[in-house]
Amino acid sequence: MNGSEPKIEIFKPFGEAFELTKKILFQPFDLKKWLVIGFAAWLANLGGGGGFNYSYNRREEMQKVNETLSQIPHSLLVTAICVLVCFVLVVIVLFAWLRARGCFMFIDCIAKNRGAIAEPWRGFRNEGNSYFLFSLLVGIVLLVFAAVFSLPLVLPIIKDSTFLRTHHVYVIVAIAALIFAMIFLLLAWSLIASFMLAVMYRQRCRASEAFTIVTRLIATHPGEMLLYCLFWIVLALATALVACLATCATCCIAAIPYVGTVILLPLFVLLCSFSLLFIRQFGPDYDVWASFVPPEFLPILLSLSSVPATSAPSSNPPPEPPPRPSI
């Protein structure tokens, strides 16, 4: 490896993220700070949670719903459906905006080891709005791609009602290909988005600029990014398992919005810290601690060679050369 190139590791940033999580949440433990950071984490993951579905007597319930709908005038039913669809779209867009703003609040809480809402909400307004609009555009592109990609499956079914019964293999392959393509695109966007947030926080740039920077970085270091992505998937699966166990252990209390985030806050802080510490290895332009390092973070962050001299000035400067003898 060239001496000027950074050494990119996977497990070392994870270990440092674990130490950072302990510093932020447990050393010392502050309930108010925990609740504030939990709120920022909840906003940053708004709309990403799930729930439980209890499917008993589902057929009887659907029959009652159909009977009720059949008694409603057709024009009124169509109007109600249109209003409901518009309301759902507005809620989705609102959640996406709050989530975009919350991402920068959560990163700020981790980077500066504090529980703050108002200051990062105002300070990163432009970046949050830019990221929201860009994410909305990406979501629309993904929906259009899914619709276009599903046409070879949907059109034959519309034209021929017996198509499903006579072309089992084609239907299965088409559905599997669509699911695989969407999972791949969603994983790619998740990877890019997590790094975009760090770049936008550090450089205070627009989302389109951060997207260009991150995609160029991924193209330059494909091997390291692939390892990171695989390790992050393992962490995500482990987090989902822990979340399920916590939900069962707390009698579904952990499934309540915000409450579950507060209970599982160490996991959210750990995952976000790991992403920030990993991309930090590529240089000061990707380092959210480049301009400010909390003093309590110095023992952890100084172990990375990518920390610039401006964020942690050396206490032992090199000795000055001896004075020249006078002639």
Residue ranges and their predicted role:
Residues 26-27, 70-78, 121-126, 164-171, ...:
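Helix-boundary and loop/linker segments of multi-pass membrane transporters
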Residues 97-126:
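Hydrophobic transmembrane alpha-helix segments characteristic of membrane transport
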Residues 19, 23-26, 122-142, 216-235:
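Alpha-helical transmembrane segments of multi-pass membrane proteins
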Residues 51-84, 147-179:
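Long, highly hydrophobic alpha-helical transmembrane signal-anchor segments
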Residues 111-117, 126-127, 203-207, 220-221, ...:
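Juxtamembrane helix-boundary/capping and inter-helix hinge elements in multi-pass membrane proteins
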Residues 46, 92-101, 105, 140-144:
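Mid-bilayer segments of alpha-helical transmembrane spans in multi-pass integral membrane proteins
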Residues 76-80, 84, 116-143, 167-182:
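Alpha-helical membrane-spanning segments of integral membrane proteins, especially the hydrophobic core
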